Amino acid sequence: GACCDGDGRTTRAGGCGRDECDTYVRVCLKEYQAKVTPTGPCSYGYGATPVLGSNSFYLPPAGAAGDRARARSRTGGHQDPGLVVIPFQFAWPRSFTLIVEAWDWDNDTTPDEELLIERVSHAGMINPEDRWKSLHFSGHVAHLELQIRVRCDENYYSATCNKFCRPRNDFFGHYTCDQYGNKACMDGWMGKECKEAVCKQGCNLLHGGCTVPGECRCSYGWQGKFCDECVPYPGCVHGSCVEPWHCDCETNWGGLLCDKDLNYCGSHHPCVNGGTCINAEPDQYLCACPDGYLGKNCERAEHACASNPCANGGSCHEVLSGFECHCPSGWSGPTCALDIDECASNPCAAGGTCVDQVDGFECICPEQWVGATCQLDANECEGKPCLNAFSCKNLIGGYYCDCLPGWKGANCHININDCHGQCQHGGTCKDLVNGYQCVCPRGFGGRHCELEYYKCASSPCRRGGICEDLVDGFRCHCPRGLSGPLCEVDVDLWCEPNPCLNGARCYNLEDDYYCACPEDFGGKNCSVPRETCPGGACRVIDGCGFEAGSRAHGAAPSGVCGPHGHCVSLPGGNFSCICDSGFTGTYCHENIDDCMGQPCRNGGTCIDEVDSFACFCPSGWEGELCDINPNDCLPDPCHSRGRCYDLVNDFYCVCDDGWKDKTCHSREFQCDAYTCSNGGTCYDSGDTFRCACPPGWKGSTCTIAKNSSCVPNPCVNGGTCVGSGDSFSCICRDGWEGRTCTHNTNDCNPLPCYNGGICVDGVNWFRCECAPGFAGPDCRINIDECQSSPCAYGATCVDEINGYRCSCPPGRSGPRCQEVVIFTRPCWSRGVSFPHGSSWVEDCNSCRCLDGHRDCSKVWCGWKPCLLSPQPSALSAQCPPGQQCREKAMGQCLQPPCENWGECTAEDPLPPSTPCLPRTTHLDNNCARLTLHFNRDQVPQGTTVGAICSGIRALPATRAAARDRLLLLLCDRASSGASAVEVAVSFSPARDLPDSSLIQSTAHAIVAAITQRGNSSLLLAVTEVKVETVVMGGSSTGLLVPVLCSVFSVLWLACMVICVWWTRKRRKERERSRLPRDESANNQWAPLNPIRNPIERPGSSGLGTGGHKDVLYQCKNFTPPPRRAGEALPGPASHGAGGEDEEDEELSRGDGRLSRSREVPLTQIHQRPQLLPGKASLLAPGPKVDNRAVRSTKDVRCAGRE
């Protein structure tokens, strides 16, 4: 058909007679209506086009028109005539109703209903996007096709165009916008509006903050890199603070500013010369001086010159402050002890070392140079530096040693080390030539020290206890206040009885006690149950991020529950969300799905809303549940030329005779251009018609959409698909966005977590995983680790980031101040304080401190050596007060040349007296003699006997033997040779020594230490050690007396019988025949000759029991001297039995004592005990010995060895 303007008629050809219609379009946009009403206001807006054409017209595609419109709007041009833009200033509701009307424009006609060409409507749903959506309408008169779309204005986003985001970088925010309108904070900014700067990592936000990223500006009263240090009270000297403007004093300090020293004595030790310091008042003290000293600090002696403080001949003058020394020429200093340095001009050449002397100097030259100033090259081989070598070859500026096999080093003094950790239990490996030897510590033995003999070797006694070795174990001698098998039990009166309750252990302190409480109790005596919040004033941060004392109990808004919930704090820092109606989930982030059960009927699409739902009905249905089919027969679509039947979204006309077509308006054809809608093809069947619908449509006239665009459902993650012909829209659930709901909304943008917390993004929720030490929903709260009172009683807890620090009171230590510092007393020695457990050396003795008691070895160190000088004043300056330097006996120099040494002696105290002296023959159970033989070539020049004796006294073995008794070691040149030194060893006092075992073990220990060669360079030259000790043997006449008595009794009876028999026989022979008398010797009586004991001495019988105990001198030679061939022992006869004669001779001398002498080679020591034979050996026949040759015991050192 054709649309004709005015009252024009159509021509026979079907066109308009006068003029066609001037068509333009009006558009009305209003809220969604299940049943569209064309009347009423256009609540969303309206628009109209200019005249677009006449009967039929076609406009360019909407996409090109839209692009052209945007281009013209930018250039200021006119809008495309076919484009209608309806702006709105509200959130797009997504559902809408669109009414489109085609009108005929005629200036000559008053507008009325007749001018309306066609009206169509569409109710549906559409999301904002750039794509166009096509709509097809087939009305009663006209057929319309148009495209629609909804676009958000610039800087508006989301499905409702109500999310505003405009990028900015100013005072009001620092962010950009993503494609979904989410604010993306720039680096260094956080918060909802990206206005909060990200402070420096670790910055304490309770005491500081920042205005620019990376900053940490402290609040008033706080300081430090992270604003975690409080500012102390101004002027606070020796104190600290936990809160600002406080001054908590350190130990021993007091006063408002902690500047008053409460223990001046302990901090400064002002008193000297043994004065006792007393704390009088803060910053004040008093010194109690010993006799002979005055002054505030006991620094001034009463008779300052009495001790002759001026050295080197200086004269002493007492002054008010003490003394002054007037020094002689060449000396200076307060005590005239500073010599003029003649070495200032560096007179020594060739790298020699200059030693300043009085009025001169001495050059100590390198080994390859000699002369007064080291200007001459020396023959290094003259000093025999090569120890284990074939020969020494002198070189220019040096020498070369041709070493023997097995040795190396410049002097062939290094033995190839065969020690590789074989010795156990701390044993010392001694390297030998092609071998090794383990020197075991006390208590261990075996080749590798693998056998334990001494139970105290592992030091089992604790806290200063002294271990005593027993046969079957050990015993600990505990210090005062300790007991138990290992001195581990404190028995001080503070803890007896135990004041600590609830199973706590008591520790004794110096003036108090300390209870180590279990976890559930606290207080002085562990009697107070430990509360979670001591005192009830808890400042625990609750799970919602608020302090419990800062708000009323109940629900509080918090970002953790989102915009649809309220946070409720639970015990233990937890929380719970109370959700608004229609929401559920841990964080109230899930909108309850009210579309469960599919309430919409007849294919309606259910749209979930907050606590409600809405049904989007397909064409042909309406109502809240899409259960109402509107009557499509209204108004009269059959034009009163037939009967109308209502269908779903359609109608059917049964036309009267002569009328055809869908609306009964034609008499010729069943089909026209508008019979089938939405592009359907009409087929005329004479009396009826049939529509072939395109894809996506169905129905008799293709008016029902199949909604095939939502099959399969393109919307994911629970999105609802709303189809409209060949297009669709997705209604996404909260937390999802995008055309098909594939993008999870980033709930972590902008950054919601503080203090380095990590944000975990969920679906419409987020969670902050806080860094260690922080808590709360957004990690802005520093956890107060001190709330649980982790520090022990009496300690102060200081909260820190991710931890705490306990400030301990005096006497306590440990991370929680739970460990007790055992108070011990120091030891004083020669004016020096030594703490408990420390060790030091005094002269030749070793000492250790045990709770105020000095435990020192008791070795008599001898007189102090001094250099003899022609000036008498210089002699006394080298010796302690009260002693004088006197010349020693001649012959003390072992390797000349030696300095002119003397010794400091005094009349009081006198050295201990002992009969055990070197170069004498005295030996008893408290006397041993050691004879040390030296290799003269290895002894350094200037070595004296006193130096060797000092080295032996300083041996650890010597000190260990002198723990309980005074040990005397006296040395002298031996008479046996020029390179031997004799050492006499004895204890003082000797009256309570039971036997000789102590002196023997001491001598053996000293010999073993000397053989190690590791203590002194002098002992490296020792080649042989000879040991002489005494063994007290038992009486040898115990079995001799009864045996001899039995023998003599038998002989006497036999003689009596024989005499009687022989007398009778002779008498009978005289009477019978009187034969001549036989005067020949009867040899059978030879065995009856009297037997004399060769060891009998006048006045003592071998058979008697009244004689004293036999004392046996054992002679042991480990390197025996050779005997000349044919050498015989003294006596009237020698039968060639040299061994027996020698033994008889030894037995015949003295009163039964046997001298035991051992010559010990340095490399190995053997002991071969030679006990006296039994009674049989004493009665054995042997050569007669001239008893006149026997000397007294005092003359015998070792028989046959002198």
Curated annotation (Swiss-Prot):
Residues 150-194 form the DSL domain. Its main location: membrane. Residues 1070-1080, 1147-1159, 1185-1202 have a biased composition (Basic and acidic residues). Residues 1-1037 are extracellular. It is found in: Membrane. GO terms for cellular component: membrane; perinuclear region of cytoplasm; plasma membrane. It holds the Pfam family MNNL. It is a single-pass type I membrane protein. Residues 1070-1202 are annotated as: Disordered. Glycans are attached at N107, N525, N574, N707, N1015. The chain crosses the membrane at residues 1038-1058. Coiled coil: none annotated. One of its GO terms (molecular function) is calcium ion binding. Putative Notch ligand involved in the mediation of Notch signaling. May have a role in neurogenesis in the peripheral nervous system, limb development and in the adult brain. This is Protein jagged-2.
